[in-house]
Amino acid sequence: NMRDIIFTFFNYFVFFYTSMLAIFFVTFAFLSFISLKRRKDYYVESYMRKTIKESPYTPGISVIAPAFNEEKTIIDNVNSMLALEYPLFEVVIVNDGSTDSTLEKMTEYYELVEVPYAYIERIKTRPFRRLLKSSNPKYSRLIVVDKENGGTKADASNAGINVASHPYFICTDVDCILEKYALYRCISPIISSEKQVIAVSGTMLMANGCVVKDGQIIDVRTPRTPIPLFQ
C-alpha cells in the first residue's frame, strides 16, 4: 500500500543521505589531514633551514659534478648549481678530458685562472692536470678540476672528492637540476638524527617538458614525446 511505499522510500532516502554525508566528512577529514601535514612539514622545514643557516656549526657541503663534452649546456648547468641555497658550499666541476669547448667556455664565462693547489690523491684516479678558480668574487664557490679522461663517471667523481674541502659531498650529474633547497634537505637528517647517518639520497624525476628558469623548475609539465612520457 501507499504507506509502505512512502516508508520504504523514506528509509532509502535516509540511508543514501547519511551515506553521502559520511563520505563527505571522511573525504573532508582526509583532505584536512593532508593539508595539515603539508603545513606542518613546511613549518618544520622552514625552521630547520633557519636553524642551519644561522648556526656556526653548520657543516660545509661540496657539490661534485663530472662534465664530459657538455659545451651546449655547461654554463646554464653550472649557474643552476651556484644558485643553490645553503650557507657553506662549493661547486666542484670535474672536466673529464672533454674534447669539445666545455673547459674553454667555462674559462671565459667564469674568468677562470689556474691556481696552485695541494692535490692529495686519497682515491686513485687518472692524472690530475690543473685546478682553476674564478678571479671574479661572484663565482668564489666554483672550483674546476681539469683531468685526463678516466673512462667512467666514477673516476671523475673520485677526483672531485680528492679536491673537495668540505666534510660532506654530493655527487651528481652536471646536467641534473637540483632543487633550490636540496642541500638543506640532504643535511637535515644527518644533523638531526640521534643515530649516525652515513648517506642520504633524493628523489629523481624527469624534467622533460618542464619549464626551467634560472636553473630552477618553475612549472611542472608532462613530457610530450613518447619515451620520456613512458619513463
Where do the language-model regions lie?
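Long helical/loop segments within the catalytic core of UDP-sugar-dependent glycosyltransferases
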Residues: 115-158, 162, 166, 180-231
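Short aromatic/hydrophobic "clamp" motif used to bind/position activated sugar donors
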Residues: 169
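N-terminal membrane-anchoring/stem segments of glycan-assembly enzymes
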Residues: 1-55
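Cell-envelope/extracellular polymer assembly enzymes that use nucleotide-activated donors
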Residues: 59-62, 90
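Short, acidic, metal-binding catalytic loop of nucleotide-sugar glycosyltransferases
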Residues: 79-88, 108-116, 193
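The conserved acidic donor/metal-binding loop of glycosyltransferases
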Residues: 173-177
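A conserved acidic beta->alpha catalytic loop
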Residues: 95-115, 149
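Short, well-formed alpha-helical segments that are part of the catalytic scaffolds
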Residues: 45-48, 70-83, 104, 155
